[in-house]
Amino acid sequence: MSAVLSTENGLILKLYIQPKASRDQIVGLHGDELKVAITAPPVDGQANAHLVKFIAKQFRVAKSQVIIEKGELGRHKQIKVINPQQIPPEVTILLK
């Protein structure tokens, strides 16, 4: 499976998360996953909440439309984005 998979109602992203980074950004491919750096520390779910907010902003959807399907407690996550309004260029490249 590639890092980005298109489904009927959205996208499924396989992510590798780097918490406590200097800034929030989609870095690029990391093996067969998309690397995302976020500023939040991995404490008490702060990183997950921050990741959902960041992904929602990047894809221009509500936070409720970003669902962590797998990897709640680890760096490797699978996220579903329902009906994205915009797709960032880093992700568009991987869809082709």
From Swiss-Prot:
**SUPFAM superfamilies, per this entry?**
YggU-like
Query: Which cellular component terms (GO) are annotated to the entry?
Result: cytoplasm
Highest taxon of the lineage: Bacteria
The protein's matches in SMART domains, at most eight in alphabetical order, are given as:
DUF167
Which InterPro entries does this chain map to? DUF167, YggU-like_sf
Checking HAMAP family in the record gives:
UPF0235
Q: Which family does it belong to?
A: Belongs to the UPF0235 family.
Q: What is this protein called?
A: UPF0235 protein YpsIP31758_0827
Q: What is the lineage of its organism?
A: Bacteria, Pseudomonadati, Pseudomonadota, Gammaproteobacteria, Enterobacterales
